[in-house]
């Protein structure tokens, strides 16, 4: 799992839309979808409900459970970067 995948997941949950998240992250929608699919394959479960006619992105039960983990992962990543930048 990569920082870019976690970032994509959190941005989709924040915006409620794959297209809005892609625009905010300056990537194409297909590229964003690939990040999410790679993450779901690694985790072994879907994070989002997929289907035609859905106006807003819906999280699966597992997706809801994963939000807190993703936020902690992102915070730890940021702490690690800051510590490395401040190291002598």
Regions found by a protein language model. Give the residues of each.
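The N-cap/first-turn positions of alpha helices
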Residues: 2-5, 29, 63
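Short alpha-helical "packing" element that flanks the helix-turn-helix/winged-helix DNA-binding module
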Residues: 8-12, 66
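Short helix-boundary/capping micro-motifs
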Residues: 12-26
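Residues in the recognition helix of alpha-helical DNA-binding motifs
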Residues: 35
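A short LG(V/I)-centered, amphipathic sequence patch enriched
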Residues: 40-59, 78
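Alpha-helical linker/hinge and terminal dimerization helices associated
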Residues: 42-43, 66-88
């Amino acid at each position: 799992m990569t920082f870019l995948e976690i970032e994509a997941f959190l941005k989709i949950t924040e915006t409620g839309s794959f297209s809005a998240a892609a625009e905010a992250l300056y990537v194409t929608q297909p590229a964003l979808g690939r990040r999410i699919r790679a993450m779901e394959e690694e985790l072994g479960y879907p994070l989002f409900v997929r289907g035609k006619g859905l106006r807003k992105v819906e999280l699966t039960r597992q997706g809801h459970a994963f939000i807190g983990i993703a936020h902690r992962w992102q915070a730890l990543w940021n702490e690690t970067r800051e510590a490395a930048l401040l190291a002598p």
